[in-house]
A protein has these predicted regions:
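Extracytoplasmic "Venus flytrap"
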Residues: 38-52, 75-78, 160-166
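Hinge/capping helix and adjacent helix->loop/strand transition within the periplasmic-binding protein
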Residues: 25, 61-63, 85-96, 104-204, ...
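Beta->alpha turn/N-cap motifs
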Residues: 98-104, 190-191, 201, 207-216, ...
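Short, well-ordered beta-strand elements
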Residues: 34-43, 69-71, 96-97, 155-160
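Early extracytoplasmic/lumenal segment of secretory-pathway proteins
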Residues: 50, 67-84
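Bacterial N-terminal signal peptides
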Residues: 8-18
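Signal peptide-proximal N-terminal region
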Residues: 57-69
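C-terminal lobe and pocket-closing loops
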Residues: 130, 216-261
Length: 261
Protein backbone atom coordinates (compact mmCIF):
# COMPACT_ATOMS: atom_id res chain seq x y z
CA UNK A 1 0.00 0.00 0.00
CA UNK A 2 2.99 2.32 -0.08
CA UNK A 3 2.68 2.60 -3.83
CA UNK A 4 1.63 6.03 -5.02
CA UNK A 5 0.92 6.36 -8.70
CA UNK A 6 2.03 9.34 -10.72
CA UNK A 7 1.18 10.65 -14.13
CA UNK A 8 4.37 9.87 -16.01
CA UNK A 9 5.57 11.22 -19.33
CA UNK A 10 7.73 8.76 -21.25
CA UNK A 11 9.39 9.31 -24.59
CA UNK A 12 10.88 6.89 -27.06
CA UNK A 13 14.44 5.96 -26.09
CA UNK A 14 17.19 8.49 -26.87
CA UNK A 15 14.95 11.57 -27.02
CA UNK A 16 16.48 12.95 -23.84
CA UNK A 17 20.04 12.49 -25.06
CA UNK A 18 19.23 14.00 -28.45
CA UNK A 19 17.60 17.07 -26.96
CA UNK A 20 20.16 17.70 -24.23
CA UNK A 21 23.04 17.15 -26.61
CA UNK A 22 21.95 19.84 -29.04
CA UNK A 23 23.51 23.26 -28.92
CA UNK A 24 21.02 26.14 -28.71
CA UNK A 25 21.47 27.10 -32.35
CA UNK A 26 21.11 23.49 -33.50
CA UNK A 27 17.98 23.01 -31.39
CA UNK A 28 16.48 26.20 -32.79
CA UNK A 29 17.08 24.92 -36.30
CA UNK A 30 15.77 21.43 -35.51
CA UNK A 31 12.50 22.41 -33.82
CA UNK A 32 11.60 25.52 -35.81
CA UNK A 33 8.42 24.85 -37.76
CA UNK A 34 8.09 21.32 -36.33
CA UNK A 35 5.19 19.69 -34.47
CA UNK A 36 5.68 17.67 -31.27
CA UNK A 37 3.02 14.99 -30.65
CA UNK A 38 1.72 14.28 -27.15
CA UNK A 39 -0.05 10.90 -27.28
CA UNK A 40 -2.24 10.45 -24.18
CA UNK A 41 -3.33 6.93 -23.28
CA UNK A 42 -6.64 7.89 -21.70
CA UNK A 43 -9.81 9.67 -22.76
CA UNK A 44 -10.39 13.45 -22.96
CA UNK A 45 -11.60 15.13 -19.80
CA UNK A 46 -9.54 13.19 -17.25
CA UNK A 47 -6.47 14.10 -15.24
CA UNK A 48 -3.93 12.69 -17.70
CA UNK A 49 -5.59 14.52 -20.58
CA UNK A 50 -5.93 17.84 -18.75
CA UNK A 51 -2.33 17.70 -17.50
CA UNK A 52 -1.05 16.94 -21.00
CA UNK A 53 -3.03 19.80 -22.53
CA UNK A 54 -1.92 22.22 -19.82
CA UNK A 55 1.75 21.30 -20.28
CA UNK A 56 1.36 21.31 -24.05
CA UNK A 57 -0.11 24.81 -24.02
CA UNK A 58 3.10 26.20 -22.53
CA UNK A 59 5.90 23.76 -23.32
CA UNK A 60 6.47 24.92 -26.90
CA UNK A 61 7.39 28.39 -25.66
CA UNK A 62 10.29 26.93 -23.68
CA UNK A 63 11.78 24.67 -26.36
CA UNK A 64 14.32 26.25 -28.73
CA UNK A 65 12.62 26.89 -32.05
CA UNK A 66 9.19 27.03 -30.39
CA UNK A 67 7.58 23.96 -32.00
CA UNK A 68 3.82 23.44 -32.07
CA UNK A 69 2.49 20.95 -29.50
CA UNK A 70 -0.40 18.72 -30.58
CA UNK A 71 -2.24 16.48 -28.08
CA UNK A 72 -3.81 13.22 -29.29
CA UNK A 73 -5.78 10.62 -27.33
CA UNK A 74 -5.10 6.91 -27.93
CA UNK A 75 -7.34 5.06 -25.50
CA UNK A 76 -7.63 1.42 -24.53
CA UNK A 77 -6.55 -1.11 -21.88
CA UNK A 78 -5.89 1.51 -19.21
CA UNK A 79 -3.36 3.32 -21.48
CA UNK A 80 -1.51 0.11 -22.42
CA UNK A 81 -2.26 0.59 -26.12
CA UNK A 82 -0.59 4.01 -26.01
CA UNK A 83 2.39 2.66 -24.07
CA UNK A 84 2.95 -0.18 -26.54
CA UNK A 85 2.52 2.23 -29.45
CA UNK A 86 5.04 4.65 -27.93
CA UNK A 87 7.66 1.92 -27.74
CA UNK A 88 7.02 0.11 -31.01
CA UNK A 89 5.78 2.78 -33.41
CA UNK A 90 6.90 6.15 -32.10
CA UNK A 91 10.00 7.51 -33.80
CA UNK A 92 12.95 8.45 -31.53
CA UNK A 93 13.28 11.81 -33.28
CA UNK A 94 12.51 14.26 -30.47
CA UNK A 95 8.99 14.87 -31.81
CA UNK A 96 6.98 12.15 -30.02
CA UNK A 97 6.00 12.01 -26.34
CA UNK A 98 3.84 9.28 -24.81
CA UNK A 99 1.77 9.99 -21.69
CA UNK A 100 0.36 6.99 -19.86
CA UNK A 101 -0.06 5.25 -16.51
CA UNK A 102 3.36 4.63 -14.99
CA UNK A 103 1.99 1.60 -13.09
CA UNK A 104 2.32 -0.32 -16.36
CA UNK A 105 6.04 -0.48 -15.60
CA UNK A 106 5.25 -2.58 -12.53
CA UNK A 107 3.16 -4.91 -14.68
CA UNK A 108 6.15 -5.38 -16.98
CA UNK A 109 8.36 -6.15 -13.98
CA UNK A 110 5.82 -8.77 -12.88
CA UNK A 111 6.08 -10.48 -16.26
CA UNK A 112 2.81 -9.42 -17.88
CA UNK A 113 3.13 -10.49 -21.53
CA UNK A 114 0.75 -7.75 -22.66
CA UNK A 115 3.49 -5.21 -21.94
CA UNK A 116 5.22 -5.02 -25.33
CA UNK A 117 7.91 -2.62 -24.20
CA UNK A 118 11.06 -2.45 -22.12
CA UNK A 119 10.65 0.42 -19.66
CA UNK A 120 14.43 0.61 -19.20
CA UNK A 121 14.76 1.81 -22.79
CA UNK A 122 12.37 4.73 -22.50
CA UNK A 123 13.72 8.21 -21.88
CA UNK A 124 11.79 9.36 -18.80
CA UNK A 125 11.53 13.13 -18.76
CA UNK A 126 9.10 14.14 -16.03
CA UNK A 127 5.76 14.07 -14.25
CA UNK A 128 3.45 17.10 -13.91
CA UNK A 129 2.21 15.83 -10.53
CA UNK A 130 2.34 12.90 -8.15
CA UNK A 131 -1.02 11.29 -7.59
CA UNK A 132 -2.53 10.71 -4.15
CA UNK A 133 -4.98 7.80 -4.49
CA UNK A 134 -8.41 8.56 -3.08
CA UNK A 135 -11.83 6.92 -3.21
CA UNK A 136 -15.19 8.61 -3.66
CA UNK A 137 -18.78 7.40 -3.72
CA UNK A 138 -21.90 8.90 -5.31
CA UNK A 139 -24.72 9.96 -2.99
CA UNK A 140 -27.19 7.93 -5.05
CA UNK A 141 -25.54 4.83 -3.59
CA UNK A 142 -26.95 5.68 -0.16
CA UNK A 143 -23.42 5.63 1.30
CA UNK A 144 -21.62 8.64 2.74
CA UNK A 145 -18.50 7.43 4.55
CA UNK A 146 -15.96 4.63 4.82
CA UNK A 147 -17.95 3.34 7.78
CA UNK A 148 -21.02 3.05 5.52
CA UNK A 149 -18.95 1.38 2.80
CA UNK A 150 -17.61 -1.24 5.20
CA UNK A 151 -21.09 -1.92 6.58
CA UNK A 152 -22.72 -2.28 3.16
CA UNK A 153 -24.46 -5.62 2.61
CA UNK A 154 -24.06 -5.50 -1.17
CA UNK A 155 -21.34 -5.16 -3.77
CA UNK A 156 -20.32 -1.59 -4.51
CA UNK A 157 -19.52 -0.99 -8.18
CA UNK A 158 -16.31 0.97 -8.77
CA UNK A 159 -15.37 2.13 -12.26
CA UNK A 160 -11.95 1.29 -13.71
CA UNK A 161 -9.91 1.84 -16.85
CA UNK A 162 -8.20 -1.55 -16.49
CA UNK A 163 -5.63 -3.56 -14.51
CA UNK A 164 -2.60 -1.59 -13.36
CA UNK A 165 -4.48 1.67 -12.83
CA UNK A 166 -5.31 3.34 -9.54
CA UNK A 167 -8.96 2.83 -10.47
CA UNK A 168 -8.39 -0.93 -10.58
CA UNK A 169 -5.65 -1.63 -8.05
CA UNK A 170 -6.89 0.45 -5.12
CA UNK A 171 -10.36 -1.11 -4.68
CA UNK A 172 -8.94 -4.61 -5.13
CA UNK A 173 -6.28 -3.97 -2.49
CA UNK A 174 -8.88 -2.53 -0.11
CA UNK A 175 -11.02 -5.65 -0.59
CA UNK A 176 -8.07 -7.74 0.57
CA UNK A 177 -6.89 -5.49 3.40
CA UNK A 178 -9.92 -3.94 5.08
CA UNK A 179 -12.79 -6.09 3.80
CA UNK A 180 -14.61 -3.77 1.43
CA UNK A 181 -17.02 -5.33 -1.07
CA UNK A 182 -15.99 -3.45 -4.18
CA UNK A 183 -16.86 -4.90 -7.57
CA UNK A 184 -14.43 -3.45 -10.10
CA UNK A 185 -16.11 -2.63 -13.41
CA UNK A 186 -13.30 -2.31 -15.96
CA UNK A 187 -13.18 -1.08 -19.52
CA UNK A 188 -13.82 2.65 -19.27
CA UNK A 189 -11.46 4.70 -21.43
CA UNK A 190 -10.64 7.33 -18.82
CA UNK A 191 -11.90 9.52 -16.01
CA UNK A 192 -14.39 11.34 -18.25
CA UNK A 193 -16.36 8.18 -19.16
CA UNK A 194 -16.20 6.99 -15.54
CA UNK A 195 -17.73 10.26 -14.33
CA UNK A 196 -20.50 9.92 -16.92
CA UNK A 197 -21.16 6.37 -15.68
CA UNK A 198 -21.40 7.68 -12.12
CA UNK A 199 -23.99 10.27 -13.11
CA UNK A 200 -25.97 7.61 -14.98
CA UNK A 201 -25.84 5.40 -11.87
CA UNK A 202 -24.13 2.59 -13.79
CA UNK A 203 -21.50 2.54 -11.05
CA UNK A 204 -21.34 3.79 -7.47
CA UNK A 205 -17.93 5.41 -7.38
CA UNK A 206 -14.24 5.14 -8.12
CA UNK A 207 -10.70 5.42 -6.77
CA UNK A 208 -8.26 7.76 -8.50
CA UNK A 209 -5.77 10.51 -7.80
CA UNK A 210 -7.16 13.26 -5.59
CA UNK A 211 -5.24 15.85 -7.63
CA UNK A 212 -7.28 14.73 -10.64
CA UNK A 213 -10.58 14.24 -8.79
CA UNK A 214 -10.61 17.71 -7.25
CA UNK A 215 -10.40 19.15 -10.78
CA UNK A 216 -12.11 16.75 -13.17
CA UNK A 217 -14.99 15.98 -10.79
CA UNK A 218 -15.38 19.45 -9.28
CA UNK A 219 -18.98 19.81 -10.48
CA UNK A 220 -19.93 16.55 -8.77
CA UNK A 221 -18.01 17.38 -5.59
CA UNK A 222 -19.91 20.69 -5.40
CA UNK A 223 -23.29 19.17 -6.32
CA UNK A 224 -26.14 18.31 -3.97
CA UNK A 225 -28.60 15.45 -3.66
CA UNK A 226 -28.00 12.21 -5.53
CA UNK A 227 -25.64 13.99 -7.96
CA UNK A 228 -23.05 14.65 -5.25
CA UNK A 229 -19.71 12.81 -5.23
CA UNK A 230 -18.47 12.14 -1.69
CA UNK A 231 -14.77 11.41 -0.96
CA UNK A 232 -14.47 8.82 1.81
CA UNK A 233 -10.83 7.68 1.88
CA UNK A 234 -7.40 8.99 0.87
CA UNK A 235 -3.90 7.51 0.71
CA UNK A 236 -1.79 9.98 2.67
CA UNK A 237 0.19 9.91 5.88
CA UNK A 238 -0.94 13.44 6.72
CA UNK A 239 -4.42 14.90 6.10
CA UNK A 240 -5.05 16.92 2.94
CA UNK A 241 -6.17 20.46 3.89
CA UNK A 242 -9.15 20.32 1.51
CA UNK A 243 -10.46 17.02 2.90
CA UNK A 244 -8.78 17.03 6.29
CA UNK A 245 -11.37 14.81 7.98
CA UNK A 246 -11.03 11.87 5.58
CA UNK A 247 -9.69 8.57 6.95
CA UNK A 248 -6.11 7.88 5.83
CA UNK A 249 -5.48 4.48 4.23
CA UNK A 250 -2.29 3.71 6.24
CA UNK A 251 -4.10 4.40 9.52
CA UNK A 252 -7.17 2.41 8.50
CA UNK A 253 -5.09 -0.63 7.56
CA UNK A 254 -3.19 -0.46 10.84
CA UNK A 255 -6.45 -0.07 12.77
CA UNK A 256 -5.54 3.40 14.04
CA UNK A 257 -8.60 5.16 12.58
CA UNK A 258 -11.96 5.01 14.33
CA UNK A 259 -13.79 5.52 11.01
CA UNK A 260 -15.77 8.39 12.42
CA UNK A 261 -15.53 10.33 9.16
Amino acid sequence: MKKQLCLTIAVVACLVSVVTGLARSSADEFYKGKTVRFVVGLAPGGGYDLSARTVGRHMGKHIPGNPTIVVENMTGAGSLIAANYTYNSGKPDGLFIGIWNSALVLRQALGDKAMRFDARKFGWIGAPTKGTPSCSIMAHSGLKSLKDVLAADREIKMGSTGPGSTYDDTPRILNQTIGTKFKVVSGYEGTGPILVAMRRQEIDGGCWGWESARTTARNLLDASGNEKLIPFLIHRREPDPEVKDLPLIPEVIKGEDNLSA
